Each structure stands twice: as C-alpha cells, then as structure tokens.
From Swiss-Prot:
Family: Belongs to the RRF family.
Gene Ontology MF terms in the entry: ribosomal large subunit binding
Biological process (GO), any one: cytoplasmic translational termination
Species the sequence originates in: Campylobacter lari (strain RM2100 / D67 / ATCC BAA-1060)
Lineage: Bacteria, Pseudomonadati, Campylobacterota, Epsilonproteobacteria, Campylobacterales
PANTHER family noted in UniProt: MITOCHONDRIAL RIBOSOME RECYCLING FACTOR PSEUDO 1 (PTHR20982:SF3), RIBOSOME RECYCLING FACTOR (PTHR20982)
Keywords in alphabetical order: Cytoplasm, Protein biosynthesis
Highest rank taxon of the organism: Bacteria
Gene field: frr
Keyword ATP-binding: no
Entries under InterPro entries matching the protein: Ribosome_recyc_fac, Ribosome_recyc_fac_dom, RRF_sf
Name by which UniProt lists this protein: Ribosome-recycling factor
Residues in coiled coil: none
Length: 185
C-alpha cells in the first residue's frame, strides 16, 4: 500500500521534472535551439499540424534556423504561422525555405529569460508540493482506515517528505544551471 503511494509520487514528480526540462527548451539562450518552434502549428489540409511534421527544421549556425517545407506551397503558410507565433524574430522567405535570423541577445533579454527560468522552476516546485499533499492525504486515509499504524504513518510522511526534498533539490539545480547558461555571454 505504502509502496504504491511512493511509486505514484515518484512517477508524478518525474513527470513534473520532465515538463520543466521541456519548458526550459522554449527559453532562448545565446545560441538558437529548434525547440523554440515546438509550439508552432501550421494549417495543413485543414488540420493544425506541428511544424516539424511538414518541414525539415535545422539550426544552420548559432543564430539561424532554416525551415524547408516538404511541399513548396507550404512556404507562405509556414511563414504566417511563425509570424503569428510571436517568437521574437521575423521569418524570411527566400523561395526555397523560411529562414529565422536571431540577433545576439542583450543583457536585459538574458536577465529576463533567467527570471522566466526561475518562475518555471517555482511552478514546478508548486507541482511537487501538490504531489506531496496528495501522497500525505493517501497516507492519512490509510491511517484513518486503520490499514497502517501511527508509527508506519509517521515513517510514510517522512519518506514522502524525503522524496519531495529530493525533487526540490533537483529543480533548484536545473534552475541554477539554466540561469548560468542564460547569463553566460
């Protein structure tokens, strides 16, 4: 019974950690990352399709992303979708592909992105604390139903807290590393 609670807490916490890592890929650092386009969807024969399913997306150098559609008529649609996504650069259609030229980041942009990373980390910590609350509620229910003793419940609360502290430390470490990456010129 308790092992199920611990396993569920660990699985949910792992998902929160992965979500944070995925969120971090959307923050622009000094070099371009094609993941900044992950949320861009284009109209493809009437359905909204992720950009990477209708085109080849490549980082050609540290400041340029090239998007080459598999079907040439998609160029205008891709260009419009990127412009609408508001990622901070204007798409440049050269007739063969859409290019995104990212200017060097200013100190202010880096600091703002570091703040965003910190906010994402705090959001992940809140999720971890909510997972802890759910696990503690499950332990409390077992104790109330007399399925476990008071001593077992105390040990269970300690284990839940230990896992929570472990994940909070991991989040702090991820945020610290991301901030260092963002502020490095």
């Amino acid at each position: 019974m308790l092992n199920e609670i611990y396993t569920k807490q660990k699985q949910q916490s792992d998902k929160s950690l992965e979500a944070l890592k995925k969120d971090f890929t959307t923050i622009r650092t000094g070099k371009v990352n094609i993941n900044i386009l992950d949320h861009v969807h284009v109209d493809y024969y009437g359905s909204q399709t992720p950009l990477n399913q209708v085109a080849t997306v490549l980082a050609t150098d540290a400041s340029t992303i090239s998007i080459t559609p598999w079907e040439k008529p998609m160029l205008k649609t891709i260009e419009s979708a990127i412009a609408a996504a508001n990622i901070g650069v204007n798409p440049n259609n050269d007739g063969e592909s859409v290019k995104l030229f990212f200017p060097p980041m200013t100190r202010e942009q880096r600091e703002e992105n570091a703040k965003s990373a910190k906010a994402m980390g705090e959001k992940a910590k809140v999720a971890i604390r909510n997972i802890r609350k759910d696990a503690n509620d499950a332990v409390k229910k077992l104790e109330k139903d007399k399925a476990i003793s008071e001593d077992e419940a105390k040990k269970a609360y300690d284990e839940v807290q230990k896992q929570t502290d472990n994940y909070t430390t991991k989040i702090d470490e991820l945020v610290k590393n991301k901030e260092a990456e963002l502020l490095k010129v």
